[in-house]
Amino acid sequence: MKRILGTAIAALVVLLAFIAPAQAADLAHGGQVFSANCAACHLGGRNVVNPAKTLQKADLDQYGMASIEAITTQVTNGKGAMPAFGSKLSADDIADVASYVLDQSEKGWQG
């Protein structure tokens, strides 16, 4: 039993070693996608079209947008004044930019 548990823990450690760099790369790519496609309206987490609905954590929470799924849907399909990017960006691009937005909102858009 101890041998199986030890093997399982070792496998988990190896797996996690590969997951963390992939997530960092996804955030870096998400930042590039954001800069190229979103920053004109959302630079620094702001919203030039509707200043009341920013990408700040409190606003994302208030409007039910503080999840990968919600942001992915919004970016893919658009809503209101925000255009749809589903035909312009790949699913990976959209997932990466959604992760980037959530990460930045947690950091207060400080970097």
UniProtKB/Swiss-Prot annotation:
Compartments where found: Cellular thylakoid lumen
Binding site for heme c: 38, 41-42, 82
Pfam families: Cytochrome_CBB3 (PF13442)
Gene3D superfamilies: Cytochrome c-like domain (1.10.760.10)
Domain of life: Bacteria
Record's comment on post-translational modification: Binds 1 heme c group covalently per subunit.
GO CC, alphabetical: plasma membrane-derived thylakoid lumen
Major localization class: other
GO molecular function terms attached to this record: electron transfer activity; heme binding; iron ion binding
Gene Ontology biological process terms from the UniProt entry: photosynthesis
Record keywords, A-Z: Electron transport, Heme, Iron, Metal-binding, Photosynthesis, Signal, Thylakoid, Transport
InterPro entries: Cyt_c-like_dom, Cyt_c-like_dom_sf, Cyt_C6, Cyt_C_IC
Signal peptide: 1-24
Primary role: Functions as an electron carrier between membrane-bound cytochrome b6-f and photosystem I in oxygenic photosynthesis.
Subunit record text: Monomer.
Family: Belongs to the cytochrome c family. PetJ subfamily.
Descriptive protein name: Cytochrome c6
Natural source organism: Synechococcus elongatus (strain ATCC 33912 / PCC 7942 / FACHB-805)
